């Protein structure tokens, strides 16, 4: 009954997801909450009073590029309900917008004007409290990303650095996204457990001296929890960050009580909490990819005992390859089903990209903490610029290799068979049985037949 009610809450549209917009053009006012760039236009997310979120398309020029979260606009356009642009694509863009709270779209182009700061503050104060919290986080994130402007001169490197450390992805161009996707490291541009895990690792290393006493240990874990959720809030409370923040919070609470928490239990508990708060996340591709990748990593971790006796650098490299391979293999069928492509050289890319992510996040933490000291900030900025440039150059080189991307888009039945085969293979590995092996052969044969029939 609980599962059925949750499913109905996901599938059936919410009452506020559809608004009867007036026909024809009208004049509107709203507060900018987010911006995103495309080659010839700029998409601006606006919060209209009393409580409606609209995505407006503006002409890309110096005026629209200067817009920031918290600005107020007056524009004239016809607002319509979200609709799909490409009818042949499997991706339901309109449903994706509605699940993210966008209830209308408008083609404004150049028929808009920026209102004064006083009007913007007045409109912002009348927004719902949740919208005000999100707006405050967006302003904070925008202010931090602007500090990179003086330190990192390259627009491309600065866009990647802002996305990787702050979750500010509005400067990412299609070329950057394509490069990272073809290289198999698109997950670096979306804040997730990897990024939060790096921050928690740095924190626990810095606070290790406090762990010698009970009060010091309590202070260290409470400070870690504060930083975890502050980072999640500033970066926009995205789904992967929420999942990772919940998991790391549970781990900290377990460690505080001198108990060894079960990672799988923490993963499923975080999924349960997220779905209770927002059941519509169940249909989000990001939710599915995020949890599949973490689940695969947790399931293959017991294989570490095969190489645990090696020297530490080799163990670290083997861990990196094992986790990267597990995450990519687990998400490959779903990625192919949704996007129609599969990267081939993801292991080669991750060997360099993940260590760079560690250094970039650590350097960004030092960069912001020591920003009052100009000399140190300048030194950190030069290091960040060099690392981000080296990372981009490496990934551009890897993505240019021949046969780097496989174009394959399985249907729903083939995708389900892939995951069924993976589950049975894992089951057979844990408890070998000829019947499970026979089931694997049947599933593999059915998958092959389904693929042939779909040609």
PLM features: what roles do these ranges have?
Residues 2-187:
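Membrane-interface helix/helix-cap signal primarily in integral membrane proteins
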Residues 19-28, 40-48, 120, 126, ...:
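Juxtamembrane/interfacial segments around transmembrane helices
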Residues 30, 77, 164, 192, ...:
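Divalent metal-coordination and catalytic microenvironments
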Residues 37, 152-156, 239, 262, ...:
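Proline-centered turn/helix-capping motifs that create local helix->coil transitions or kinks
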Residues 63-78, 96-97, 102, 117-119, ...:
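Non-globular, low-confidence helical/coil segments that flank catalytic cores
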Residues 106, 173-346, 408-454:
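Hydrophobic alpha-helical transmembrane segments in multi-pass membrane proteins
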Residues 132-134, 138-139, 166-171, 235-240, ...:
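Hydrophobic alpha-helical transmembrane segments
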Residues 295-403:
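Alpha-helical transmembrane segments of multi-pass integral membrane proteins
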């Amino acid at each position: 009954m609980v599962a059925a009610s949750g499913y109905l809450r996901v599938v059936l549209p919410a009452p506020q997801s559809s608004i009867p917009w007036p026909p024809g053009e009208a004049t509107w006012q709203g507060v900018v909450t987010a911006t995103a760039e495309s080659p010839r236009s700029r998409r601006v997310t606006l919060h209209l009073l009393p409580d409606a979120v609209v995505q407006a398309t503006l002409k890309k020029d110096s005026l629209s590029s200067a817009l920031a979260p918290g600005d107020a606009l007056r524009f004239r356009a016809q607002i319509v309900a979200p609709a799909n642009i490409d009818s042949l694509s499997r991706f339901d863009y309109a449903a994706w917008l509605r699940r993210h709270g966008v209830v209308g779209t408008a083609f404004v182009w150049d028929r808009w004007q920026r209102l004064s700061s006083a009007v913007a503050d007045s409109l912002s104060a009348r927004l719902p409290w949740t919208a005000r919290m999100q707006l405050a986080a967006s302003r904070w994130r925008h202010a931090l990303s602007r500090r990179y402007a003086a330190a990192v001169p390259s627009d491309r490197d600065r866009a990647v650095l802002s996305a990787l450390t702050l979750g500010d992805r509005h400067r990412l161009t299609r070329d950057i996204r394509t490069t990272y996707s073809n290289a198999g490291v698109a997950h670096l541009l979306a804040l997730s457990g990897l990024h939060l895990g790096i921050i928690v690792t740095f924190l626990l290393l810095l606070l290790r001296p406090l762990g010698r006493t009970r009060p010091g240990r309590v202070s260290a874990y409470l400070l870690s929890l504060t930083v975890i959720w502050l980072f999640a809030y500033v970066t926009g409370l995205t789904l992967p960050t929420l999942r990772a923040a919940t998991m790391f919070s549970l781990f900290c609470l377990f460690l505080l009580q001198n108990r060894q928490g079960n990672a799988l239990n923490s993963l499923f508990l975080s999924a349960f909490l997220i779905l209770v708060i927002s059941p519509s996340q169940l249909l989000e591709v990001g939710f599915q990819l995020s949890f599949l990748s973490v689940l695969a990593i947790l399931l293959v971790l017991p294989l570490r005992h095969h190489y645990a006796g090696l020297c530490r650098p080799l163990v670290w490299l083997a861990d990196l390859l094992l986790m990267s391979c597990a995450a990519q293999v687990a998400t490959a069928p779903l990625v192919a089903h949704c996007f129609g492509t599969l990267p081939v050289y993801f292991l080669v890319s991750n060997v360099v990209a993940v260590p760079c992510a560690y250094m970039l996040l650590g350097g960004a933490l030092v960069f912001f903490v020591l920003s009052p000291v100009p000399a140190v900030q300048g030194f950190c900025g030069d290091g960040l610029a060099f690392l981000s440039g080296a990372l981009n150059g490496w990934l551009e080189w890897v993505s240019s290799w021949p046969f780097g991307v496989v174009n394959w888009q399985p249907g729903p039945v083939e995708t389900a068979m892939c995951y069924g085969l993976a589950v049975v293979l894992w089951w057979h590995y844990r408890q070998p049985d000829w019947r499970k092996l026979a089931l694997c052969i049947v599933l593999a044969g059915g998958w092959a037949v389904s693929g042939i029939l779909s040609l």
